[in-house]
């Protein structure tokens, strides 16, 4: 029993390695880009002619800053996909697609529930009674701020469903939806159902 639990925890830990591997590169891009586009830094070191607005180097550093920031802004989605890939036994690419779909479905369903309960108003603004920082924009969808934890939960759930259903055989009339296609469709339905239960 202990060996089985330890084995599963090892697989979960290894599944974190893929998303974590991108963080140092993204951190360097973000750090260098933001440091050398900071107006105070540029003025303090007298680098206005070299790094000031309108220079080619400034444009390159702004791009580096934005590229590094894109990774950190979307860490939950990256972890959802990485964990789903790492935990899937076979057909890992299908698991990755399922994770992306489930992540968007989860956030859209949460947005709908927040709108229904009046925490997000009809004009898209957040109600005054909601604690600041509780609701944030996730890939353009106003949802609860769950961070990387939400992505990990989605990835683990998708991998569990994928490993169970990616080989399923359906009757001939529905055979198009069998196998990996069923895993993707079923994951979508389960993500919606799970969020509706909340």
Please annotate each region the language model reported.
Residues 1-3:
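Transmembrane alpha-helical segments of polytopic membrane transport and secretion proteins
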């Amino acid at each position: 029993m202990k060996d089985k639990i330890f084995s599963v925890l090892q697989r979960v830990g290894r599944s974190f390695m893929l998303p974590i591997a991108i963080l140092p590169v993204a951190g360097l891009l973000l750090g260098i880009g933001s440091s050398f586009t900071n107006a105070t830094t540029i003025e303090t070191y007298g680098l206005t002619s070299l790094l000031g607005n309108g220079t080619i180097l400034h444009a390159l550093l702004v791009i580096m800053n934005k590229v590094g920031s894109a990774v950190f802004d979307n860490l939950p989605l990256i972890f959802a996909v990485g964990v789903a890939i790492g935990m899937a036994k076979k057909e890992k690419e299908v698991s990755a697609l399922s994770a992306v779909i489930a992540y968007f479905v989860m956030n859209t369903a949460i947005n709908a529930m927040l709108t229904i309960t009046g925490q997000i108003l009809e004009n898209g603004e957040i109600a005054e009674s909601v604690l600041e920082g509780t609701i944030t924009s996730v890939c353009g969808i106003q949802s609860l701020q769950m961070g990387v934890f939400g992505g990990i939960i989605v990835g683990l759930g998708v991998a569990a469903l994928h490993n169970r259903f990616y080989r399923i055989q359906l009757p001939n009339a529905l055979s198009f939806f069998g196998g990996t296609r069923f895993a993707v469709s079923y994951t979508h339905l389960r993500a919606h159902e799970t969020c509706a239960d909340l």
